[in-house]
C-alpha cells in the first residue's frame, strides 16, 4: 500500500512525532477531529517586562459529514509566527474549514469565516504537498491564500526542509513568508527563516533548539529580530496537560539590537480526540506502535 509505505518511512514517522508533540500549526490545520486547546502563558523579556496571555483554540468536527467539515474558533494561527519568535497580538476568528483532497502527500482545504479584530469576513484555500528526499530527508510546501471583505488579501507561504540525524535528533530548516494587504506598506513581505534542532528525550518530553531571523521588505529591507531559544515541552501524567519552559535571547531592531534575555512559561490543556489520524495519514505520538 503506497500510503502505508510512505508513512512508515523513518523520516516521515519522525516528522509526525515532532509536528504532533510540539503542535506545529501546519500539522494541526490538517486535523478534522474535535479538540480544544487552552494555553495560559507568562512572558518575561528584559526590554518589555512581564505580561500574561491566554490563548484558546477549538476545532469541532461536524457530525454526519465524514470528517470533511470542521468548525474552527479562537486564535488565528495565520495571523503571526510562532510565539517563541513573534509576540504580535492574536486575532480571533470563527469559521468553517472544508477538507478536499487528502492523501499521504497532498492535503487541501477551504476556509470561510470572520475575523473579529478587523471585523471582516474571509475565505480562501490552503494547499500542502510533502515528499521524501532520500531515506532521511523530506520537504513540505504549504500555500494559504485569503481574501477579506475589507478588500485585503493575505498570502502565507512556507517551506520546510527536514533531516533525520539519529534516533533522537531531528533537524528542520523553515522559510515562512507572509504578505498581508493591510500591512503591506509598513511590512511588505514579512519573512521568518528558522533552524530547529529537536531532541526527543522520551515519548513524553523533548527539547527544541531554535535560531530565527525575522525581517520585512517595506519600506526597506531590514531585520526586525534575531532569536535564540531552547524549548522544553513535557506531557504530565495526565494526557490532557502539557507544560513548556522556553528561555530565549533576542536582538530586536525596536531596541537597537540590545541583548534581550527572556523566558516563556506555558501550560496547555488539551481536550478531545488526539491529533492523530488513520495510519495512512499519520499515527499519534502517544500510541504504543509509534516509533522513529
Identify the function of each model-found stretch:
Residues 64-194, 199-213, 217-226, 235-241, ...:
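Outer-membrane pore/translocation modules
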Residues 1-20, 264-292:
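Flexible, glycine-rich linker and terminal segments associated
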Residues 1-104, 114-122:
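Outer-membrane beta-barrel initiation region
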Amino acid at each position: 500500500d503506497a500510503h502505508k509505505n510512505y508513512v512508515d518511512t523513518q523520516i516521515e514517522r519522525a516528522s509526525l512525532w515532532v509536528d504532533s508533540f510540539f503542535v506545529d500549526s501546519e500539522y494541526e490545520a490538517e486535523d478534522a477531529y474535535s479538540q480544544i486547546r487552552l494555553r495560559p502563558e507568562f512572558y518575561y523579556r528584559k526590554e518589555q517586562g512581564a505580561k500574561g496571555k491566554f490563548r484558546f483554540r477549538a476545532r469541532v468536527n461536524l457530525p454526519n459529514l465524514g470528517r470533511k467539515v470542521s468548525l474552527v474558533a479562537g486564535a488565528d494561527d495565520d495571523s503571526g509566527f510562532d510565539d517563541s519568535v513573534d509576540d504580535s497580538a492574536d486575532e480571533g476568528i470563527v469559521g468553517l474549514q472544508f477538507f478536499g483532497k487528502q492523501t499521504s502527500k497532498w492535503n487541501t482545504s477551504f476556509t470561510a469565516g470572520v475575523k473579529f479584530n478587523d471585523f471582516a469576513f474571509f475565505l480562501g484555500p490552503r494547499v500542502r504537498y510533502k515528499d521524501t528526499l532520500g531515506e532521511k530527508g523530506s520537504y513540505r510546501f504549504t500555500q494559504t491564500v485569503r481574501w477579506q471583505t475589507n478588500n485585503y488579501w493575505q498570502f502565507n507561504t512556507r517551506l520546510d526542509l527536514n533531516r533525520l540525524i539519529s534516533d533522537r535528533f531531528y533537524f528542520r530548516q523553515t522559510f515562512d513568508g507572509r504578505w498581508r494587504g493591510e500591512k503591506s506598506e509598513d511590512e511588505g513581505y514579512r519573512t521568518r527563516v528558522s533552524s530547529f534542532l529537536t531532541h526527543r528525550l522520551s515519548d513524553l518530553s523533548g527539547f527544541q533548539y531554535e535560531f530565527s531571523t525575522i525581517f520585512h521588505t517595506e519600506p526597506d529591507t531590514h531585520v526586525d529580530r534575531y532569536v535564540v531559544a531552547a524549548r522544553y515541552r513535557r506531557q504530565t501524567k495526565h494526557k490532557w496537560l502539557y507544560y513548556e519552559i522556553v528561555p530565549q535571547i533576542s536582538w530586536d531592531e525596536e531596541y537597537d539590537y540590545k541583548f534581550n534575555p527572556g523566558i516563556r512559561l506555558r501550560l496547555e490543556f488539551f481536550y478531545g480526540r488526539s491529533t492523530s489520524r488513520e495510519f495512512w495519514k499519520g499515527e499519534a505520538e502517544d500510541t504504543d506502535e509509534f516509533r522513529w
